[in-house]
Amino acid sequence: MKIYTRTGDKGETGLFDGTRVSKADPRVEAYGTVDETNALLGVAATSTTDAELRGILHDLQRDLFAVGAQLADPKWGVKPRKEKTRLTEGRVAELEALIDRAEAELPALKRFILPGGSQVGAVLHLARTVCRRAERRMVSLTATAAVAPLLITYINRLSDLLFVLARLASRRDGCEEIPW
């Protein structure tokens, strides 16, 4: 399979079902922003020496491929075509368990903190903000297209997890949080 097709040279792209749309289409904006989040998780995963964190990030990247695939398929916006692209309520619960586990290792927040910390922590903070943008793009898409509510729930919970993982990575790397 070639990486270039020349079919997008005039500002259009193909969706999963073959439909051609503008690269500025809200659906493309939504799954494109999910892809940006995924790329940032890749940067964090390759930057950390923490094997547990790297494994978590790789699992999240796989999830984001499923989210992107479902968003790129207008005929299956609510029900995914393939099992591989299906997220479940159980997966959201797993993210919540990861949040709880990470928070148990962290001091309670009493005020806002500045994004930053260690290099990995800073990348995870950036991933969190891009994830929030993905969520906003997905919510915007719901004005014109069907989007599975679970996808929005998943992305919302993911951004919470990324915040906690950013704090955890920075703490494990010996960096102090800077209060606002």
Enumerate the predicted regions with their spans.
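Phosphate/pyrophosphate-binding loop motifs in nucleotide- or prenyl diphosphate-using proteins
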Residues: 1-180
